[in-house]
Every structure is written in C-alpha cells, then in structure tokens.
Amino acid sequence: MDIKKFRGSRTCGGGTHKNRRGAGNRGGRGKAGGCKHHFVRAMMRGYSYGKHGFKRPVEVSKDISIVNVGELDELAPYLVEEGLAEVKDGAYHINLENLGIEKVLGSGRVTKNLVVTSEEFSASAREKIENAGGSCIDAE
C-alpha cells in the first residue's frame, strides 16, 4: 500500500491514535503470536497441531465402486425385474460391468445361486458365492 495516500491524515489509515502503539496490536514482535489464544491450554491437554503421518498421493489411490455379496443376494430379484440381470438354469446371472460396479466385497450372507461377472472379487466374496453354489467370472 502506498503511504502517500494517507499523508495529511493524523493516523495514516491505522484507526485511532492508540492502535499502532507497541507490539500488542499485531500479536507481538517478530515471529511471536503465531498461535491463537488458547494454544497453551490445548498443548497441556495434549492436542497435536501441525502435520502428522503420511498421506497417499492422489495419483496412486483409486476410488472404485464396490458392492457387498449380501446386497447382491438381496437385490438379485429386483435386478431381474428391472432387466439388469437374468435367471438361467436356476441361477441369477448378474453382470456388474453394466451397472458400473468394479469390485465385489464379502460382507453379508449369500443364500441364492449367483453367477457374478465383475472386474475384481475379494477372497471372502469369491468363497461365499462359490459355497452357495454360484460362480465368479472375472471380466477383462
């Protein structure tokens, strides 16, 4: 900011005449006053400030869409009604690529005979589907 603009005024844009006295108006001198008012109390209670740990780069981490086998088991009849799955030889054939789902996880119970096509299966999901008489087809 150009100080010339404020020449002729008593306080040069600093508010009242009291405001620019001492270092109290800017939280101390130098690097003092970098923290807020209750910082010491927070430190005594053990709160941690600053950066801690490791954050995975965004390029490395991927956000995939998932579904659990329990949800597939419940939704199989509705998917057939909607035309998103079909029943062949007493088994529900579900192609998850068409639904935009990339991975099947193993939470829940499987009671129906499911033939599921997906890019990835967790070990527990594959085991549960095959124990119920179904099969897992890896899409490429």
UniProtKB/Swiss-Prot annotation:
InterPro entries: Rbsml_uL15_N, Ribosomal_uL15, Ribosomal_uL15/eL18, Ribosomal_uL15/eL18_sf, Ribosomal_uL15_CS. Keywords: Ribonucleoprotein, Ribosomal protein, RNA-binding, rRNA-binding. GO terms for biological process: translation. GO terms for cellular component: cytosolic large ribosomal subunit. Residues 24-33 have a biased composition (Gly residues). It comes from the Archaea. Residues 1-33 are annotated as: Disordered. The keyword Nucleus does not apply. SUPFAM superfamilies: Ribosomal proteins L15p and L18e. Transmembrane segments: none annotated. GO terms for molecular function: rRNA binding; structural constituent of ribosome. Part of the 50S ribosomal subunit. Binds to the 23S rRNA. Belongs to the universal ribosomal protein uL15 family. This is Large ribosomal subunit protein uL15. It comes from Methanosarcina mazei (strain ATCC BAA-159 / DSM 3647 / Goe1 / Go1 / JCM 11833 / OCM 88) (Methanosarcina frisia).
